[in-house]
Amino acid sequence: MNRFLIIDGLNLVRRIHAAQPNENDVNGLPERVTSACRKLLSKHNPSHVTLVWDGDAISWRKKLYDDYKKGRKPMPEALSQALPALKQHLAERGFHSIDAIAEADDVIATLASKMVQAKGEAIIVSTDKGFTQLLSPQIQLWDHFNQQAITIEDRERQLGVDRSQFIDFLAMAGDSGNKIPGIPGIGPKSACELLKTFRTLANVYASLDKIGAKQAKKLEEGRALARLSYKLVQLQTDIPLNTRLANFRVELTAKA
């Protein structure tokens, strides 16, 4: 069975670089990143591998909601300037890349989904828990830095809801890390209780007459933000990709 190792490029590289005392010091970065990639190959033994990188264009999520991911620390300039040479270094060693137009997330989600459609498996390497909405027996999420899988069960315990409710939960409760607004006045506890009672966001809105007046008012006033938040959280799995799986087959140079 084919197994596709899909590495969230900047998620990996920025964390490796952050271990440096001086953010302007990129000496040895290509070797450290290559070493990490080879360890991932050894751990997961994939048939295919790629790194997916964020692009420079404004993402559709940012266009939809200007506060999306607002306030995040920008990439150090030295690291930004080092990326082209880093990608070339990796390619020469068998680790080829896909450059997203904007965010890498939807490209990663599309690659993983297409691999499953082709009766294969996908392992996403990232610490971004947004990918947990994709998890299934065929799609895994691996945290390289803690050397452990991020499982559906972990996320269920963290949020207090079932796997099928992850997106609905965040649409109501929001996600401060990504500046997803959610519904004002409906925090994680309320979102969890509502989903335990009504199962889905759609059912919540179909049952406002069964909810206390104060909370129902918050839900009604926040309906548009809930719809917006749902769109922001949900990963797209059908991004057009002008590439072939064969381009990412693991090469002997990557295993060396």
From Swiss-Prot:
Binding-site list for Mg(2+): D105
Residues that bind K(+): M172, A173, P181, I183, I186
CDD domains per record: H3TH_53EXO, PIN_53EXO
Cofactor binding description: Binds 2 Mg(2+) per subunit. Only one magnesium ion has a direct interaction with the protein, the other interactions are indirect. Binds 1 K(+) per subunit. The potassium ion strongly increases the affinity for DNA.
Domain of life according to the entry: Bacteria
Gene Ontology terms: biological process: DNA replication, Okazaki fragment processing
Record function comment: Has flap endonuclease activity. During DNA replication, flap endonucleases cleave the 5'-overhanging flap structure that is generated by displacement synthesis when DNA polymerase encounters the 5'-end of a downstream Okazaki fragment.
NCBIfam families: PRK09482.1
Name the record gives this protein: Flap endonuclease Xni
